[in-house]
Amino acid sequence: MALSVRRRVADIARAEPGRTALVGFGTDLAEQVLSWREFADRVADAADELRAALDLSMRSCAVVPAGNTLPAAIGIAAALAAEVPVFPLNPATPPAERDALFRLLGRRFGHVHLMDAQLTPQRVDLTAGPEPLAAADSVAYLLATGASSGIPKISARPGPLRYDPAGTPSLVIKQTGWRAGQRQLIVGPLYHTAPFTAFIDGLLDRNTIVLQPFFAPQWTVELVRRYAIEWLQLTPTHMREILRLPDLDPAGFASLRAVLHTAARCDADTKRGWIGLLGPERVYELYGATEGVGVTLVRGDEWLARPGTVGRGFVTQIRILDDAGHPVPPGTAGTVFMRTPQRVGRSDYVNEQAIRTTLDGFATVGDHGRLDSGGYLYLEPRDHDIINVGGEKVDPDEVEAALRDHPAVIDAVAVAVPHRTLGSVVGVHVVLRPGASVRRAELAAHCGRRLAGYKIPKQFTFVDQVPRSAAGKIQRWRLAPQHENGATAP
């Protein structure tokens, strides 16, 4: 029987009142623990207060500043329990972008309530605008998407949310070493899709959830050891930083049943490093999108047999189409379209153009890739990321991976830099290890031993950090096309 979130949380609290539901950390990093009884009571109180603050005759949504804190976790759960659409907001969102998001939400729902640190809902004063859209299907939650290319869109997930033992978590997550009641660590921010949905799945499946308020690689390793974490979701950026730790001991990960990585393309060195650390049977990769058009899954042993793949469709059909909308043969790159039965898990944008869809129900978020003869998907860079050097196409990921292989380099981003003759050349923003020093000519020579000549960066800029989203996705749009600081390589 499908249960409401409120009923499910209450049932767990009745059955296991003293078991730990959540572990968080205060601003002083002191441990904060809530039992299931304490968590259920606080969720019920906050849900009641939220519903009391709303005009139930009007459509409304709740916005929760979603740092990885106990109040944020309670606020999200309370909105779901109250069956009020909830939007987890990055607390560091600039005011102009935040106001734009509020206007989008107001356009869909009419009223927006922001929950403060005490979980008190405050109505957002929206400037006069168009009347709210006509009533639509019920919404469980809303998530920001597309931040790697500018101001995010908002994707709405149909609701209300229900707990169904057969469908919680989803079938694909159940294939990744997941067990009900396990100990789970949330590393990524709750306002991002993968950590948010992992939190909801863990909540409904009675897990003990540890919330890491910010990523620090040594701390992540310590939390895994201290709490005997069994299931962990990471991004490739997290994985690279952890692998760089000195004296990394595989014994510290003995409790882990599985690591699932998502959110961005993972370079081969990082993937092999984690397979070496845990063994191939404990490393999983999931490719999907906030919009829920479909997913692929690959385990480490499959990846070793087909390096670079993100797996085969899981309850998902995949079709690769060219620019004219025609299917292409295996091995040929094109736009990735996916289809799931009855639009399972599909979300749609709030006040945005609908997701691009074919007449027979295949949908795309614009990613590019190719299929091999076995149906395994390999992602390619999107057209706007590819660097065109005199007609030769350069995959920025390949350049970045070559630079990260240098012992002085922590991170790098490759971008197109205008060139009078070639149209563009490769430029890079490079982050060095603390205390490291390296000449641009040395980095260029290092790349020259790994890359074709036209792929070698011609301009270098040394920076303290490169712009990434909370999920670790590179935000190339934040990088200026022209490099400064005398950054041209000799």
Give the ranges of each region predicted by the language model.
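Flexible, low-complexity linker/hinge segments
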Residues: 1-4, 116-139, 164-166
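Conserved AMP-binding/adenylate-forming
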Residues: 32, 48-93, 393
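AMP-binding/adenylate-forming catalytic core of the ANL superfamily
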Residues: 72, 232, 340, 360-361, ...
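Gly/Ser/Thr-rich phosphate-binding loop
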Residues: 147, 204, 231, 247-306, ...
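Conserved AMP-binding/adenylation subdomain of ANL enzymes
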Residues: 166-183, 191-230, 245
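Conserved ATP/PPi-binding loop(s) of AMP-dependent carboxylate-activating enzymes
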Residues: 312-313, 326-357, 392-394
